[in-house]
Amino acid sequence: MKKIYLILFYILTSLTINAQINTIYSKSYGQSENPAIIFIHGGPRGNSTLFEGTTAEKLAEKGYYVIVYDRRGEGRSIDTTATFTFQEAIKDLNSLYQKYNIKRANIIAHSFGGLVGTLFTEQNPQKVNSLILTGALFSQQETYDHILETTKKNYLEQKDNLMLSKIAEIERLPKNSAEYRQQCYEVASKNNYFKMPFPTKEANQLREDYEKSEFGKNNIRNDNAPTLFYQNETQNNIDTKPVLKNLKKQVKLFAIYGQQDQIFSQKQLNDMKRIVKKKNFKIIDNCSHYPFVDQQTEFINTIEKWIK
């Protein structure tokens, strides 16, 4: 009888582990023998559908093995038990390496994914050939301060007292709270900080095709993710510049940002350029927070040049 219980316990444990693994949505593009690229999306609350639907296959056609995935509890990786911590994300990323039998990869880390990619690389430098920060967060409080300072200036010029009061309210919120982060980004969005100034025909077509595609229809957003992240993760408002300075001794570091990505100050961009060095830093004009859509051709050409 004891033996039967042990067998049942083993089966149930195996099923639980497999269920947890299967909650992670991932997909590969291209030939597995080609240099690997893993894309880490933004968030918390995001997904990789925009990159997957517009750029993943095109990069694969250039001779790369491109892997996209949605973090646990975000997008298509539905998991009600997700904690949304960095360590959980790092553990799942390690599992992705095992699933696709990858020893080393080039990581494209976008927005909040820049923090995940940086912390993963810090813990696993032997698994990373290059870390490509793409519109990536790296000094969160500086970003929040910049958003509030510049939008306040805009509203002062417009004499918009209602929004000036709103900014003052945001400034009084706890800096390590989901509400503070959310309201900073909401006011940035209201001021078009995430939009390219002069959309090109190519960029418009990419977005239109994406919206009509299965990827656009699966643009799932977990509105609880930011709250749970701030509840469970102590490192919820960090500056990774010191980490990046150490990392460049171990892995190749690159950074690509939109000239009109207005959530970053000029000081922040200069700081990043100093860390990765000028030859590994790219600013794209008429481009905001999504370089792989706003200026896709230049984005792909830059990636090719860096990791050829």
What are these regions (language model features)?
Residues 49, 71-86, 142:
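Glycine-rich "HGGG/HGxG" loop immediately N-terminal to the catalytic nucleophile
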Residues 44-55:
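The serine-hydrolase catalytic nucleophile loop
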Residues 88-105:
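Conserved acidic catalytic loop of the alpha/beta-hydrolase fold
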Residues 287-296:
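Catalytic histidine-centered segment of alpha/beta-hydrolase-like enzymes
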Residues 104-146:
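Conserved hydrolase catalytic core segment
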Residues 133-176:
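Flexible "cap/lid" loop of the alpha/beta hydrolase fold
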Residues 249, 255-257:
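Short beta-strand/loop motif that positions the catalytic acidic residue
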Residues 60-76:
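Conserved alpha/beta-hydrolase
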